[in-house]
Amino acid sequence: FRFIPGIYHNLPDTLRRIPFPGNANGCHDNLVASTEVMFARTGGREDIRLPFSMIGTPPPVLTPDAFLRMLTGLLQTATHLPAHEIAYFANRLLVFLTSCDRRRLEVWEHTPWWRFVRAASMSPDYQRLLAIGLTRNIVATKAEIASTRTVATCAEAFVFNVLGRGADGQPDRVLNLPTNEAWIDPWVAHLRSLGVAFRVGWSVRDLRLAGGRIAEAVVTDPQGARQSVVADHFVQAMPVEHARRTWNVAVRAADPQLARCDKLATDWMTGIQFYLTEPTPIIHGHINHIDSPWSLTSVGQAQYWKSRDVPADYGDGTVADCLSVDISEWDKPGILYGKTAKQCTREEIAQEVWAQMKGGLNDTGEHVLLDAKLHSWFLDPAVGGLGTPHPTNDEQLLIHPTGTWFNRPASRTAIPNLFLAGDYVAVDIDLATMEGANASARQAVNALLDASGSGAGRCTVTPLYRAPEFAALKRHDETRYRLGLPNAFDLG
C-alpha cells in the first residue's frame, strides 16, 4: 500500500503536477484520508481503535505546558499506560522538540531511541507501544539501535500534523485507486509526453571516470549486452544498495562521501497482498499488529476505491477486497513453524502472516478474518530464494541506526557532473520515504542547474514544519548546550 501522510510536502507537490483526467489538482486529488488507526493486540486483549485525523480546534499558541497536556491526553486515550509512564514519554518528546539543532545532531543522533525513552525500565506495554511500535513498524529499525533524531523527528512531524500545523493534509492518506491507476501510469504518460524515454530491464553496471568527470555509464540491456551511455550530466536515482555497486575505485576516490555509503544499513520491509471473496473493511485506516512477531501493518484497500466494482473490474469476478500487508521483521521466528520469514517458503510466509493477523484480530471472539474467504495471495516478487540458505531481496529499505546521518551523502557530489537522488541521500525528513526520495531529486536537479549555470527556475524543497513558538526555547537550548548543560526540560 501507499501511505502519504500530511507531513509530506514535496511528493504531494509532484502529484499536483501530474495530470489526471477530471482532476483539477492532478494525481493529488486521488489522495483520500483515512479516519482511524488500530493497534491489534493478542492474547484476548481488546484492540485499541482510535480516530486519527487533525483535531478540530488546535491551540492557537503552543506553549510547553499546552503541548504536554495535549500529548498526555492523546496518550492516555490511545495507550492506557500508567500515568507516570505517559508523563515521562510526553516529557521526552518535549525535550526533543525544544532541543537545538546541534544537540539533535551531536547527541540525539548518537542516542538509541530505546535509551532515550528509558524503555528498559518501563512496562512491557510501554516498550511495545511507544518504543518498539514507533520504530520497527514504521522505519523497520530496532528500537535498541534506532537513532533518536530520526524517530523523534518523525514523531514531532506527526504531532504537528494532528494539530493541523503546516500540513499538506490529513495525517493518514492513501490512494483512491490501485497505485498504477492512481499515480504511476499517469506519471509515466506525462513524462513520456515531455520526452522522457524509459528503458525497462536495463541495468547500470559501472560509472567510468575520465578527467575528473563521469565520462560514461556502462549499462546492460535485457539480453545482457553491454552498452555505453554518454551524457553531459548523470543523475543517479537508485537505491543505495544498487548505486554503490556502480561506484568503482576511481569514482569512490574522487568523492569520499560515496565510500561512506558502504556503512549505510538496509533491511527487509516487504509486502504481501491477500485477496478476499467478501469486503473486509476492518477499520477505515491502517492496522498496526503491534504484538505480531513479524511486525505487520495492514490496510483494507477496496473501501477506498469508490469508483471501482472490485469483482467486476479485477480478477476472476470472485475477489471483493484486497488486504495489503507490510512485513517489517524477517529475522524473528513466527508462530506456526518456528522459523524466521527468511527461512520460510513463500507459501509458509503467506500462512504465517495470515495466522499472525488472525491472532490479533480474531482473539476476542470476533471472526474478522475467515479462512473460507481467502481467495489467494501475492508476495512481492523482489524477494527470492526463500526457504533456502541464501534468501535475497532486490528492494531493501534503508534503516536508521545511530550515526546513520553522518554516512548519508549530499545530492551534489565532488564529481561535477554526478548527482545523487534516492531515499538514502541527506534531506530534512531524515527518513527513508517517498518524500525523502522526492526531496533529494529536487536537490539533485538544483545542483545540476547550478553546475551548468542554467538560468532556469530552481525546484522548491520544502522542509518539515517547525513550530515558531519553540524557536526561542531552541535558541536557549543552544546556549545551554554550548555550556555543557542538559536541555532545560530534561529530567534524565
PLM segments and residue spans:
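Conserved beta-strand->loop/alpha-helix structural units within folded catalytic cores of enzymes
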Residues: 8, 120, 194-196, 200, ...
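Active-site/ligand-binding neighborhood in enzyme catalytic cores
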Residues: 76-213
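Rossmann-like nucleotide/phosphate-binding core characteristic of flavoprotein oxidoreductases
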Residues: 68-138, 347, 351-373, 403-406, ...
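Dinucleotide-binding Rossmann-like beta1-alpha1 core, especially the glycine-rich loop
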Residues: 1-88
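C-terminal segments that line or cap access tunnels to active or ligand-binding sites in enzymes
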Residues: 164-175, 231-233, 238-408, 414-439, ...
